[in-house]
């Protein structure tokens, strides 16, 4: 999502973090499945039905019950990790290109701690080009990079599902045109 202020000298692209539908889906699905495994394993240990729709007391605790308890515990921890990344909105932020101040600001949220907020600032004069990196195949990658004169490539696109090729090209061209720099492909 881009936002160009009326002065047309400031461009701000909002970056979606981990609060996407797919993350909510996987965190919920893993939690429900892991809870089922954990309750089935505990049912076999305590010989009490903790799952109302299944008879888990017939499971032998060693080896089936203990394995299900282990997988359930691991799944619960994985889902908690996913829920925490959603709550903390890891990866969210913005790219701000400000011609008035001559600064490019890249801001992202990280994990809690010393580096929770990551803010990179560059002088517009330090920017050499905007680069598009496209790799097709089983794990496609379509990314836009801000290339500086000291040969650093800073990613501008969000992490997750790749954007459509036309969207990547259009967004990169708009940024390059706004900054008056070269657009290059990889």
From Swiss-Prot:
Membrane protein topology class: Multi-pass membrane protein
UniProt key word Lipid metabolism: no
Subcellular compartments: Plastid, Chloroplast thylakoid membrane
Sorted UniProt keywords: Chloroplast, Membrane, Photosynthesis, Plastid, Thylakoid, Transmembrane, Transmembrane helix
Ranges that cross the membrane: 21-43, 66-88
Source species, domain of life: Eukaryota
Principal cellular location given in the protein's record: plastid
Single GO biological process annotation from the record: photosynthesis
Cellular component terms per the entry's GO annotation: chloroplast thylakoid membrane; photosystem I
A Pfam family assignment: Ycf4
Family: Belongs to the Ycf4 family.
Reported function: Seems to be required for the assembly of the photosystem I complex.
Name of protein: Photosystem I assembly protein Ycf4
Species in which this protein is naturally found: Porphyra purpurea
């Amino acid at each position: 999502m881009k936002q160009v202020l009326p002065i047309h000298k400031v461009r701000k692209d909002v970056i979606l973090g981990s609060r996407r539908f797919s993350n909510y889906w996987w965190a919920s699905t893993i939690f429900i499945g892991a809870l089922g495994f954990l309750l089935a394993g505990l049912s076999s240990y305590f010989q009490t039905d903790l799952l109302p729709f299944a008879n888990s007391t017939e499971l032998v605790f060693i080896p089936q019950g203990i394995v299900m308890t282990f997988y359930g515990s691991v799944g619960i921890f994985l889902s908690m990790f996913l829920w925490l990344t959603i709550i903390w909105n890891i990866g969210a932020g913005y790219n701000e290109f400000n011609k008035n101040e001559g600064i490019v600001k890249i801001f992202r949220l990280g994990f809690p701690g010393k580096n929770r907020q990551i803010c990179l600032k560059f002088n517009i004069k330090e920017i050499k080009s905007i680069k598009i990196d496209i790799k097709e195949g089983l794990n496609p990658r379509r990314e836009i990079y801000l290339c500086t004169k000291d040969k650093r490539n800073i990613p501008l696109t969000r992490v997750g599902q790749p954007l459509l090729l036309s969207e990547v090209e259009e967004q990169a061209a708009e940024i390059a045109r706004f900054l008056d720099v070269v657009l290059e492909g990889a």
